[in-house]
């Protein structure tokens, strides 16, 4: 994207298309995607946000991602645990927007330290489309540090105490399901009252020790999700686009260029 932006003619507008931030939606943003998108970052905006009459609402049913390995068996989950989803090391979310966690082995090391120093059980799940394999990390797993690659992500979110993520879509899905989230990287949803954020291992451990007394606000979370569903996301997934969805995209493009 940055190369294309550098090569574009002067005064040439841009639109960025991406998978939708909510289930069964599409992203169309004139500024960028992920951390570079145009979603407001001000908690006060969401505290006072009111969706237009008849606007779409966020769905709380996630759409499962198909794993590369379809022979994975679910594991029995402990009664209390922290969920840490892996991301794809090659993705820009990690390469560009993760200042202090360079890859999933570093993320695993943080989870391991969290389990040792806090006594919490930590459950990991590898990214379903990642080409990386981690036999060395699986060899370190035990009853307080385990992988649940065969379990549905929604189950792992709903049954955990809280979610720790760099900046994954799983963090956004966790907000959708009403779970507390701690981010470690640059995420567009790093908004006070919406998530807690850690810029170091020490901050991660300190926040974990402070759970559940985190400064989170339901009002901010509800306003954030209402805004995404009502105004930011375009209803319908681009992979299954029909005429109506293409018309919604066209209307959004016209509105953003002032041509509507």
Protein language model features and the residues they cover:
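A donor-sugar binding/catalytic signature common to diverse glycosyltransferases
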Residues: 1, 150-197
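Active-site and donor-binding regions of nucleotide-sugar-utilizing enzymes
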Residues: 1-39
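A short helix->loop->beta-strand "cap" motif at the edges of active sites that frequently abuts
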Residues: 10-14, 120, 179
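Generic beta-sheet signal
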Residues: 15-18, 125, 166, 184
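Short loop/turn segments at strand-loop or loop-helix junctions that form parts
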Residues: 19, 79-93, 126-127, 186
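Leloir-type glycosyltransferase catalytic cores
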Residues: 32-79, 194-260
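Mid-to-C-terminal functional-domain signal that highlights helix-capping/loop sites
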Residues: 92-107
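Catalytic donor nucleotide-activated moiety binding site of glycosyltransferases and closely related
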Residues: 108-147
């Amino acid at each position: 994207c940055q190369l294309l932006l550098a090569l574009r003619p002067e005064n040439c507008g841009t639109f960025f298309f991406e998978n939708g931030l909510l289930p069964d939606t599409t992203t169309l943003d004139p500024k960028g995607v992920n951390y570079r998108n145009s979603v407001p970052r001000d908690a006060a905006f969401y505290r006072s946000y009111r969706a237009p009459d008849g606007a779409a609402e966020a769905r709380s049913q996630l759409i499962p991602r198909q794993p590369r390995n379809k022979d994975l068996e679910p594991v029995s989950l402990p009664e209390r645990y922290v969920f840490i989803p892996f991301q794809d090391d090659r993705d820009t979310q990690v390469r560009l927007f993760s200042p202090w966690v360079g890859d999933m082995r570093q993320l695993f090391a943080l989870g391991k330290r969290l389990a040792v120093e806090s006594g919490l059980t930590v459950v990991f799940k590898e990214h379903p489309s990642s080409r990386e394999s981690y036999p060395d990390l699986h060899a370190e797993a035990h009853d307080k540090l385990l992988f649940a690659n065969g379990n549905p992500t929604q189950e792992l979110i709903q049954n955990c105490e809280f979610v720790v993520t760099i900046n994954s879509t799983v963090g956004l899905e966790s907000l959708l399901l009403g779970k507390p989230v701690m981010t470690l990287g640059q995420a567009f949803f790093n908004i006070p009252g919406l998530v807690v954020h850690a810029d170091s291992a020490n901050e991660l451990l300190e926040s974990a020790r402070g759970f559940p007394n985190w400064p989170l606000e339901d009002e901010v979370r509800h306003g954030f999700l209402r805004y995404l569903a009502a105004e930011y996301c375009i209803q319908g997934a681009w992979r299954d686009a029909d005429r109506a969805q293409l018309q919604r995209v066209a209307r959004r493009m016209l509105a953003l260029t002032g041509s509507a």
